[in-house]
Amino acid sequence: MKPIVQVSLDLTDIKEAMEMAHTAMRAGVDWLEAGTPFILAEGLHGVRALRKEFPNIPVVADLKTMDGGYLEAQMMAKAGATHVVVMARAHPETIKVVVQAGKDCGVTVMGDNLGCEDMVAGARMLEDLGCDMVIHHIGYDERRGIAAAGKVPPNPLDQLKAVVDAVGVPVQAVGGLSLEQAIASPSYGAPLVVIGAPLAIDADSFSRGAGNVEEVLRKICEKVHAYGDVAITPRKN
């Protein structure tokens, strides 16, 4: 699979989100993500706006579905999302119906292992239940709370290779990665590179970050795309 650069639009203002999306497209980004704060602020209107503005670009709707899975996935698909996200900590039946909605509506289902006691087992379970891709995710509050207690928070790269080896679907690492670490994800076998805070988004205010975002994104895209194909190896058991 060719490596993909995805920009997470974790913004609460639709004008800022659209400006960031246009910046990302000029820089060579492949996918746009309607981040959770953006969806909470703008709802289906925000997803529809992204689809209208960028008719040929994949749009990930990061709703973090925990229940009502079929309806939520269906609604996002009808609004124009090409990818939806369901949480591993949801009931297995929720994951199953999101997967079914993905098949019925023609969207890709990404399963997120945020909060799993065993992150590798959570990733395997998501694949077993039919998810097309796995998000290996260390949460913002988890990282911040552990750091505030004077401890070193976990990093997605700590277990990324183990997650990649455990599943036979594409993997994305999310949560607290530096730009250099995010760019290195394909070297672990994870072709889906997501960029959000701290480059594009101020993680505390959920507003656009400062600096020459377009130029930095362009360099990131060049480095990630230079990896070439990343092998996705089917599971052996």
Language-model regions: role of each:
Residues 1-70, 126, 208-219:
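Conserved N-terminal beta1-alpha1 strand-loop-helix module at the mouth
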Residues 26-30, 53-57, 78-83, 103-108, ...:
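Glycine-enriched alpha-helix->loop->beta-strand junction motifs that scaffold or abut catalytic
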Residues 40-64, 97-115, 151-173, 211-234:
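Alpha-helix-loop-beta-strand connector modules within alpha/beta enzyme cores
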Residues 81-93, 134-146, 188-217:
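Glycine-rich phosphate-binding active-site loops on the catalytic face of alpha/beta enzymes
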